[in-house]
């Protein structure tokens, strides 16, 4: 049987994916009922409340967070220069913004949202269980000597391609937990080095993301007092990401950009295993319902969420099942199989997915530098082609027509997910590669 034949994928879509051709896929399942295990409004409120009551603790632990009072928040940057430079004429419609999670302090990526939330939830639980904190206790007590001594008896473990490991590792080690990060072959050397300087134990694996996660999960299962942060199924991570929705809503209101039937919001999100975009989409849908249209961006070598959403929902699928190799410069997105939790929720809520090849990643990275003054890592540039896909492709225009959307009234938010902690020499290497690529032929949108 040919590779991919048993996945219930449309033959034309399968051929496009197997040829590594950048593709826009529209989700026919959008609007279906949410699964029974979907988070509740109370779950979302609890996550937001946790990050707020722990803000003072975070500000005490990390000087970088003191200007925000310990709140995990990033700016919303207008992207008109990027819009003007878009090559497809229709792609210039609406208002464009970049959500700058690339500059989130301490972790330097979107993973601060989910990772910090999970570690804080664990720390609160342990502290309350041992009488070190109560419901009304100032959470700065979690940085006390007594709390650190208690946390030191516990291990926090995670499997990662890099950025989630940084997020978990930085906070867990700062609180006094023994911290172990299993890192895949895709993880960058500087990320491993940064963790080790904080006393984090880094376990390197020759295999991909899934193998690193599985190794961590198996090790944690045999250890007492060990908490495994499961990027493939953690509700705490998911809810931490979802808190970004209220932050974005406040920023859009301040910018005078309403979100309603006449003024839809399009959000374009880089996607690896699916937890971060899934959580953000879930939070935005809770606020805006059908007026938000979310598209996830994946490498052509690693479209694990697209494969899962477009295929049979009942069976987990991998990009290896359709003959792809999961090899991409977008190390943070090099994931072969989607999170079952995130995929089930995105199936009901995502508008679609698009893929981007490595040449496009570097072209977008250079556009971000030259047009907006933003230095990104390659995976963080994955979603920059989103507005052009929507307004400049046949499928995108059909999506707009089918919903009676006026492109000029839309707001597009492109999520930039990481880059501020990348060493300067790495940024220079990325940009030199992108400029050399441009000289020998450039890349599409």
Curated annotation (Swiss-Prot):
Cofactor or coenzyme needed: pyridoxal 5'-phosphate
Catalytically driven reaction(s): D-serine = pyruvate + NH4(+)
Single GO term (MF): hydro-lyase activity
Gene3D superfamilies the record matches: 3.40.50.1100
E.C. designation(s): 4.3.1.18
Positions bearing N6-(pyridoxal phosphate)lysine: 111
Oxidoreductase listed as a keyword: no
Keywords associated with the record: Lyase, Pyridoxal phosphate
Signal peptide: none
Pfam families, alphabetized: PALP (PF00291)
One GO term (biological process): isoleucine biosynthetic process
PANTHER family from the UniProt entry: D-SERINE DEHYDRATASE, THREONINE DEHYDRATASE, MITOCHONDRIAL-RELATED
Similarity comment: Belongs to the serine/threonine dehydratase family. DsdA subfamily.
NCBIfam families attached to this UniProt entry: D_Ser_am_lyase, PRK02991.1
Protein name: Probable D-serine dehydratase
Upper taxonomic lineage: Bacteria, Pseudomonadati, Pseudomonadota, Betaproteobacteria, Burkholderiales
Underlying gene: dsdA
């Amino acid at each position: 049987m040919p590779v991919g034949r048993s996945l219930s994928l449309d033959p034309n879509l399968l051929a496009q994916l197997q040829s590594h051709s950048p593709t826009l896929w529209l989700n026919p399942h959008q609007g279906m009922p949410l699964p029974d295990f979907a988070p509740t409004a109370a779950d979302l409120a609890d996550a937001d409340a946790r990050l707020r009551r722990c803000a003072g603790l975070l500000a005490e632990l990390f000087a970088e967070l003191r200007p925000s009072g310990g709140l995990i928040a990033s700016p919303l940057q207008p992207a008109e220069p990027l819009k003007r430079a878009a090559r497809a004429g229709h792609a210039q419609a609406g208002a464009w913004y970049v959500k700058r999670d690339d500059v989130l302090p301490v972790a330097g990526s979107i993973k601060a949202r989910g990772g910090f939330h999970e570690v804080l939830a664990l720390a609160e639980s342990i502290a309350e269980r041992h009488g070190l904190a109560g419901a009304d206790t100032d959470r700065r007590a979690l940085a006390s000597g007594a709390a650190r001594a208690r946390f030191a008896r516990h291990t926090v473990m995670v499997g990662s391609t890099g950025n989630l490991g940084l997020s978990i590792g930085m906070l867990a080690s700062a609180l006094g937990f023994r911290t172990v990060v299993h890192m895949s072959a895709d993880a960058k050397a500087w990320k491993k080095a940064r963790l080790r300087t904080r006393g984090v134990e880094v376990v390197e694996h020759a295999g991909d993301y899934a193998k690193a996660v599985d190794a961590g999960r198996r090790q944690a299962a045999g250890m007492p007092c060990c908490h495994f942060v499961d990027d493939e199924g953690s509700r705490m991570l998911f809810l931490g990401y979802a808190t970004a929705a209220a932050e974005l809503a406040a920023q859009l209101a301040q910018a005078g950009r309403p979100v309603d039937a006449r003024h839809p919001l399009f959000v374009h999100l880089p996607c690896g295993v699916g937890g971060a975009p899934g959580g953000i989409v879930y939070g935005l849908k809770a606020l805006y319902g059908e007026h938000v249209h979310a598209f996830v961006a994946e490498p052509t070598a690693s479209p694990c969420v697209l494969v899962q959403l477009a295929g049979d929902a009942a069976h987990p699928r991998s990009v290896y099942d359709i003959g792809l190799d999961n090899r991409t410069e977008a190390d943070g997105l090099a994931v072969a199989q989607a999170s079952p939790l995130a995929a089930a929720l995105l199936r009901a809520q995502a508008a679609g997915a698009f893929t981007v090849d490595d040449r496009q990643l570097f072209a977008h990275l250079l556009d971000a530098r030259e047009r907006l003054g933003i230095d990104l890592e390659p995976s963080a540039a994955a979603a920059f082609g989103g507005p052009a896909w929507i307004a400049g492709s046949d499928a995108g225009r059909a999506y707009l027509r089918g919903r009676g959307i006026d492109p000029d009234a839309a707001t597009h938010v492109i999520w930039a997910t990481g880059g501020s902690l990348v060493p300067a020499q790495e940024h220079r290497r990325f940009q030199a590669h992108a400029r050399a690529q441009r000289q020998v032929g450039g890349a599409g949108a």
